[in-house]
Amino acid sequence: FHNIYSYTSLLDKKALLNSSIPLDEIENDFLDKFIYLFNEIKNETYYNKMMYVFEKIHLVGLLQRLDVSTMAASVEARVPFVDHRLVEFAFSIPFKYKMKWCEDRSKYNSRVLMSDQISEKYDTPKYILKKAFENKLPNEILYRKKLGFPVPLNNWFDGKFKKYAKTILLGSAAKSRKIYNIRNIKKMLNNDRLHKDHDFAMKIWMLVNLELFSQEYFDN
């Protein structure tokens, strides 16, 4: 599960970052925290333990990103779906309603897939919420295809942003930092997959953000 959950695999990190960085140790530290939280609550189902881990790790990250981005724009955000009473209620609901498979074999078919590969193909997202509002909202709204907040990274890298990424990641500041595998990053920046494959482009996007963060807060 940990390997599927991660945005970037350990092998990818080793390919993108300098070999002097103790990535195995860092990965094990995170995994230890994951296991500790999973075992922290006793006498609970496997699914509720997973929910608990997500509450303590994943949700915290989402809320932090929301707070930072909204406050930067002088906006006060509210998150009613994380009201403690609603979260406690969610833990009490049988798992078969929280993860509503389309068919009996859907669970098996999706066992090694990422959530974006499962959603709406093998399950019904937010099933309980949709059922609760069936008499209040038309079906074309309730059951329309889910749309997140996609960023067309692969399209961006087909234009000026690719040149910008090269300037940032292959520049003297990035090289002097000695945390990147410049040779592999250069190969990726010249790979045609960059403007065809969103997941491939995401790795370069994350590195650009890391380097810009480093320049802003460590170099000045």
Name each model-derived stretch.
Residues 1-220:
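Adenosyl-5′-phosphate
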